[in-house]
Amino acid sequence: LSQNKQKLAEKPMAAVAVGFGHQGGKRKTSEAVYITEEQTRTEIKDTRISVSITKTATVDSYTNAELRKKYHIDKYDLHPGYVFPESVRSLIPRNTPEYVDKGFNYVERIVRALYYFKQCALIGPSGTGKTHIVYLIAELCGLPIWEINCGLQTSAYDLFGRYIGLGKENWIDGQIVMWCRNGGILYLDEANMMKQDIASRLNPVLDTRGHIVLTEKDNEIVHRHPHGYLVISMNPFSAEFVGTKPLNAALRRRMSVWINFDYLSVGDKIFPDEVELIAKRSGIDKNTAEKIVRTGAELRRQYKNGDLPYGPSPGDLINWATLIADGCTPIEAAVETIVGTTSDDVEVQAVVKRIVESVFSSS
């Protein structure tokens, strides 16, 4: 005896989640989940009875819809009419905090570049939110993200795939090949640290050919998914970033759009929204928040001039402010946060501490 039953139902359930980002933020999202289909199957064989229930749900995040309007990306649908397979939906980011910029419309510009050209490049110093914004875009556009750090230890086998065990029976796809097959955003972080052999193998998939040849797998040709997008990010090529080198010329030509990132506040230029951000997310008063931002701006200036190895991100400043809100003095909190974050070198830490003391000793 075999019985199959299908029924349609809608059952809303509320869910609240919290996420964190490079700007130290956390965003609560209120989501409505609707059960759109329920399948029940009952089988009786001999004296055994088995029952299986399969439920399919769709999630509608009101917060994300509002953010799409806020960032002016409603008109750019990066996967029209296409639903990503269940196997990769877990790679779609959730609860990514909003991104605060200086009116440069980074989100809109990146989404527009992906919509028209399918790939773009982000360049800027550490702590300016390049990775944060890519994750935010992936969430707002409903795209799985495949992140690869292009360090010198990353091998072609990790990215394209390899056989495991003896013989040629068990092949495992690498990250890039899985992206080609499934779509989404391939995010190559620290792209100007990429090995030359890896960069050259990417060229065919980024131009009109649109495919990768797996020489390790009997020259199998894997075509790029129609909803496969590429974002590369990098720090500026300089001596401070060990391992960086000028980006491969062929790869550079295939990046249709280049977007430059910078810190919110640098030197004497203090961005009021960053002060508001620090005060709001840590709970400290605006006067203390302004001093924290001024300290961060000076550290960033010295970093950009090559005098310090790191410039603090807004998230670093919020960590500092959070300890102050908990009762630590500004100096104590700085020693536990941005002083240690900047460098392990005792002399460099002393320089950072002096900058903190000079800002907080002023009226």
Predicted regions and their residues:
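C-terminal regulatory/interaction module of P-loop NTP-utilizing enzymes
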Residues: 2-363
